[in-house]
Amino acid sequence: MKKISVFLVLCLSLGLFAACSKEEEKTYDYTAGDVYDAIKEAYGEDFLPDGDMNEEEYTVTYGLDMDKVEDIKAGITMISFHPDRLLVAKAKEGEGESVEETLEAARDNMVETGMWYPANLAKVNASQVVRAGDYVAFIMLGAVDEREDATEEEAAEFAKEQVQIGVDAFNALFEE
């Protein structure tokens, strides 16, 4: 009887482990606007984009193939001094990685060849592209570093912390 009980407990335990190890693909039903708004909310008054991007910007500036995009919401600052921008794309099923690669290339191009005010270089360099499944975000956001005596390293660290606010808000939507 004892051997049967031990055997049953072992079988039940193995069954539980097998059930836990099955990877379930979590699906989300956010619009690009939902994700955009969550990131915007995380920044509060430090969210500077106040104008919408248009399809020409999506395709020319960012190189997006709109046939791979199901939904998109993007904003940019209308004051040219600030580089702040947020682009959130919900790619068509299975196209998330492709959209991510395209936005990474656009980011790299902006970092390497963009004409930026020196005060904005840290923010531009700290920008990130993040992805969760078929949702992708290009994040170049954050408070303005008002310190006039900040070293290059301090400015870079401040900018990284500011961009991370958006990354964390994005990731929070997709945590299991």
Feature locations, PLM:
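C-terminal motif of bacterial Sec signal peptides marking the signal peptidase cleavage site
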Residues: 15-19
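Soluble, non-membrane globular domain cores that form compact, hydrophobic packing
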Residues: 21-85, 91-176
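Positively charged n-region of N-terminal signal peptides that target proteins for export
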Residues: 1-8
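Repetitive helical segments and hydrophobic/amphipathic motifs
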Residues: 11-12
